[in-house]
């Protein structure tokens, strides 16, 4: 069977090349677990003090806020690193992955990450581990 994993902006354009979706892993995760899909994370070492971790967290939030206020300032950078060059595809990609969870995981996001860790541990991929989150400022 010829198969592949479609990621990033290509999830919006793969049909143009004649590819067919067998399963959308995001949909599968949400239907199987009942949780949002935890797509990525920004991590800090546990020995980093809370103040330093909070500074990083605040800087990321400020960056996201700036990007939302003036999309024109970031579109050139995004275009340089995008797999698909069409503006509408890039905007869909950003809108899908830079969302309310980017600013604040909330209980929904924390539950998704906790479930991911529990499943990874149960499958033998990681030792038992509970993620810690940077306290809100």
Residue ranges of predicted features:
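Conserved C-terminal helix/tail region of periplasmic/extracytoplasmic solute-binding proteins
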Residues: 118-137
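Generic structural "secondary-structure junction" signal
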Residues: 44, 50, 103, 128, ...
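Secondary-structure end/capping motifs
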Residues: 49-119
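Pocket-lining segment of extracytoplasmic ligand-binding domains
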Residues: 1-80
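Short secondary-structure transition/capping segments
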Residues: 30-38, 113-124
